[in-house]
Design a protein with these regions (language model features):
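Mature N-terminal, pre-catalytic/accessory segment of carbohydrate-active enzymes
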Residues: 34-166, 565-622, 626-689
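Carbohydrate-binding surface patches
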Residues: 479-527
Length: 942
């Protein structure tokens, strides 16, 4: 997911332009004085004895940092500094120190903070003068970090978005200490520098400046990914109304001139910089490609290729912008001039949901299939990350900062796993680092530029690189266990290393660790295995024979060992014991037919741990119901195995609201203290046989049981939607009544074909209804059921301006999991509007009507069975009285600034599970927080 899609930030991020007024001056505080005397007030600043705020340690030798308190006063001043030191839940030191400040001269007090091991620390200092006036109360952070690998590592995965605004010398020192091995862009290579006007190109003095900059990065052990920073100022295509645009806002006006600039940027530097990113986020009709189309981008890539490659065949051209963009644009099936890149870009901002792994594997497979060089340059994840403001807004600031730190290693590890399994090089650039300057997008800064001090994620990064650099990822240890990710490495010394973390679960947000998998990992043969937490704190020194380690969501535990990779693998799998508080994923399922004497309460039980379990499941039926038996053994359930346990219903009561709460209790054998309880509200979700007329009387739906979905905003505003479905020999019917205060519509497709229907008010109908999904590049992968599953069909209904009802095909066999763009070739199964009107159409019927008075939108859809041929065959072959199971889900999009956004049946009918291509848009699809994968069941009654 693009950061700009995620947070709507401006282009100054890419340009390296400092946003004015973003930050206050360097942190300081004034004493309590009258307003007219404010200019003469004393000032106080905090810093550390090492200006980076980072203290590398080696072996068991501790760091000895000092806090520097500088007081500047117009008159002589004395007082005290009260300080306290904390590291997560520990308080390793505190004290009070006196100070004396000479008049008009900065006076610095050095406060030793003790002997400290690797971790992230916070120092709170309160400075008070002798009169009792508080001059400063501030908390600043620093890191004690493990030693990182020195020198250049061109094959390293560890990159960083290092801001050009930041003071260069100290920023490079910070990056070097963190173990950063790649930076993105060369500050002295700007389009206007390379070609200040048509036909004129830079000369040796400017080239020498660029080469010196690159050499300086190399001196710090850091490689540079070259970047073409958009247009020359004189070569920007005007806007749609002829208005001038900024240099990043549109495609080049003269593409040939742009290609010459790119060639002249690369030619004198290609011996130092072999990899070049062609354009940042070239979203068609978006923020950097405002009037450009998909073919324009493909043309640009081809023209650059044809200009550069004859002379410099070893140069790698890196293109695209996201996995979905690469599939939709760069590799658009059947389109002209596809695949003129050596490697591709993705910007996977957001939580480390397993869909990041799914999408990266897809990215690699596309590159290998469709790049002109089979993706020889690998994958370049040139921006990704999380931020407290956007990803942890409901947590206290300090806790949110630790939340960001937790997400770093899982993000890298998921991408690294995809690269290792597909044998493709990958580089990953966390966004971003600026030591002392603000910029557009600095919510993602890993330093506090106001205080020039690191945040916890800096220590997490250094810990990761110190333990994983110079190591080759061998395999994932728990491919069947949804709770756990384990990554086995072979170090350069041949010894085994590993990283393990428990996954997070979505509970309406991904902020709360309590919602994720929590437990312990016990190693029963731990000799020679050293373990470290995600901030570098050592957990075990390798001398104990048995150790038990805590597992918390996204908190990576690293293992460094004296063992071979095979022996470490055995210690972490065969000889290990996992004890999770929620070892089973328990999901009461929807009823697939109207309630009657043959009904059962069905509960899906999945073992999410890496070990086989014996358990007992007891259910609590809805009020007024009786089932027998209530308790059923679930023995020998293997990792990743899912069973549906049926409880025959003896007595039931029909709910007018079609909502039934089923509770459950699970106990696991040999774990007497372990008890897992919960409940789920389930509904009857079935399609009876009915002849329906789209646009006809509502009474024809009277005896079709509706399902309901509810969305609630943070402010407590609640909206509900109801869905009814039916079928006959010609169509599958859906009727939806959606509460919506304000209708948000696109222009009709015939007016603007670039508008995405799923971004307006709309509903989506998603089906997993094809056994052979030949265009699903991940089918058959060992992790497919864990997190890679995609749907087969997706349809979107929306009301366009002018009262135009539209039904769009977003996905079906033959669409290659692409999204519609007007200048792409027509696919074997066309994307876009279907042949469907209210009264006729070969592919369906559709009527979307708006009731502004009652703030409701009604959707009536008839989908021809020709659009779901495999499901149609099953339904038609079913015996009278039987039920055909269908995997189906709906999504409601309430668009606009005041809308509720997306509401998913998959998150309301069950706990979501990560997948790959599921709901639209396909950028960000498949994550638990975007509906997850479609695996909810419905029944089609005959």
């Amino acid at each position: 997911m693009s950061r700009r899609k995620l947070v709507g930030l401006g282009a100054a991020t890419v340009l390296g332009a400092t946003a004015t007024g973003v930050l206050a001056p360097h942190a300081q505080a004034a004493g309590r004085v009258a307003p007219q005397a404010a200019a003469a007030a004393p000032t106080v600043t905090l810093a550390f004895s090492d200006p980076t705020g980072l203290y590398p340690v080696d072996g068991d030798a501790p760091a000895t940092p000092e806090l520097l308190v500088t007081v500047t006063s117009p008159t002589a001043l004395n007082g005290t500094v009260a300080w306290s030191l904390s590291a997560r839940n520990e308080s390793p030191g505190s004290g009070t120190e006196p100070f004396e400040a000479a008049p008009a001269t900065p006076s610095t007090i050095r406060i030793p903070l003790g002997s400290l091991g690797p971790d992230y620390y916070l120092v709170t200092a309160t400075v008070t003068d002798s009169a009792g006036t508080q001059l400063l109360a501030q908390t600043v952070g620093f890191g004690v970090i493990r030693p990182t690998v020195a020198g250049r590592r061109p094959q390293s995965v560890f990159g960083m978005g290092i801001r050009s605004e930041s003071t260069p010398a100290i920023t490079k020192q910070i990056a070097q200490r963190m173990g950063v091995k790649w930076t993105r862009g060369i500050a002295s290579v700007q389009p206007d520098t390379v070609s200040p006007r048509a036909g004129v190109f830079w000369q040796q003095p400017q080239i020498d400046v660029a080469r010196a900059e690159i050499a300086d990065w190399h001196e710090h052990g850091i490689e540079t990914l070259g970047g073409i920073n958009y247009n020359m100022s004189w070569n920007v295509q005007p806007g749609p109304n002829g208005e001038p645009l900024k240099l990043y806002q549109n495609r080049p006006k003269d593409m040939a001139a742009h290609v010459e600039m790119v060639y002249h940027a690369i030619a004198p530097l290609q011996d130092l910089v072999p990899n070049w990113e062609l354009w940042n986020e070239p979203w068609v009709h978006g923020w950097t490609w405002k009037t450009g189309d998909a073919q324009d981008y493909r043309d640009m890539c081809r023209m650059i290729w044809e200009r550069v490659k004859p002379e410099y065949p070893d140069v790698n051209l890196i293109g695209g912008g996201s996995v979905s963009y690469n599939r939709d644009i760069v590799y658009a099936q059947g389109s002209r001039d596809t695949g003129y890149i050596d490697g591709s870009v993705n910007h996977a901002y957001g939580y480390p949901d397993a869909t990041q792994y799914a999408m990266t594997k897809t990215q690699i497979k596309m590159d290998k299939l469709w790049s002109r060089t089979n993706g020889r340059a690998g994958q370049w994840q040139t921006e990704l990350g999380t931020a407290t403001r956007y990803n942890f807004p409901d947590l206290p600031a300090e806790e949110a900062a630790y939340g960001v730190a937790r997400t770093l290693a899982p993000t890298y590890l998921l991408h690294m796993l995809a690269g290792a399994e597909e044998d493709s090089p990958i580089r990953i650039f966390w966004f971003s680092l600026s030591y002392d300057k603000g910029y557009s997008g600095d919510d993602f800064n890993i330093y506090d530029a106001k205080t020039k001090t690191p945040r916890p994620v800096v220590v997490a990064y250094a810990t990761m690189t110190s333990l994983l650099e110079d190591s080759a990822l061998q395999e994932e240890l728990y491919p069947d266990a949804k709770s756990t990710w384990g990554f086995l490495f072979r170090g350069a010394d041949g010894r085994g290393r590993a990283a393990v973390y428990a996954d997070q679960l979505y509970d309406g947000t991904d902020e709360h660790q309590s919602a994720g998998y929590t437990g312990t990992l016990t190693l029963n043969d731990a000799h020679g295995i050293r373990a470290y937490d995600h901030l570098g704190r050592r957990l075990t020194d390798g001398r104990a024979s048995c150790v038990t380690l805590a597992l918390k969501p996204w908190e990576t535990v690293y293992f460094d060992s004296d063992l071979s990779p095979a022996a470490l693998r055995k210690a972490l799998t065969q000889d290990a014991h996992f004890d999770y508080t929620t070892p089973l994923h328990v999901s009461p399922l929807s009823f697939v037919k109207p309630l009657d004497s043959t009904s059962t309460i069905d509960v899906r039980v999945e073992n999410v741990t890496p070990k086989t379990l014996d358990a007992s499941l007891r259910i609590n039926p809805p009020q007024g119901w009786r089932v027998a038996p209530r308790t059923v053994p679930v023995n020998g359930i293997k990792p990743g195995e899912s069973r549906v346990i049926s409880f025959p219903v003896i007595e039931f009561e029909v709910s007018e609201k079609n909502r039934y709460t089923v509770g459950y209790d699970v106990t696991v054998a040999h774990r007497p203290a372990s008890r897992q309880s919960g409940s789920q509200t389930v509904q009857v979700a079935c399609l009876p046989f009915r002849h329906i007329t789209v646009g006809g009387s509502a009474s024809q739906w009277n005896d079709v049981v509706p399902v309901t979905m509810t969305s609630v905003t943070a402010a407590g505003d609640s909206k509900s939607s109801s869905f009814q479905a039916a079928w006959d020999d010609a169509f599958l019917y859906v009727r939806a009544l959606v509460e919506d205060d304000l209708q948000v519509s696109n222009a009709a497709f015939t007016v603007d074909a670039y508008k995405f229907p799923f971004q307006a008010d709309s509903i989506q109908l998603a089906f997993d209804a094809a056994a052979d999904k030949t265009e699903d590049l991940l089918a058959g992968d060992p992790h497919y059921e864990k997190c890679l599953r995609s749907i087969s069909h997706l349809y979107v209904a929306t009301l366009a301006t002018g009262g135009r009802s539209e039904l769009h095909r977003q996905l079906a066999p033959g669409t290659n999991y692409q999204t519609f763009y007007p200048t792409n070739a027509v696919l074997p199964t066309p994307l876009g509007p279907m042949d469907a009107q209210q009264a006729d159409g070969t592919e369906g019927r559709v009527l979307v009507s708006r009731d502004d008075a009652n703030r409701q939108t009604r959707y009536e859809i008839a989908l021809a069975w020709s659009q779901l041929p495999e499901l149609a065959a099953e339904v038609r072959a079913a015996r009278p009285g039987s039920v055909t199971r269908a995997t189906f889900a709906v999504q409601v999009q309430d668009a606009g600034a005041t809308g509720h956004g997306a509401t998913y049946w998959t998150t309301q009918a069950a706990h979501p599970t990560s997948g790959c291509y599921n709901f639209a848009p396909f950028w960000g699809t498949g994550a638990q927080f975007t509906g997850g994968r479609v695996d909810t069941r419905w029944g089609i009654g005959r």
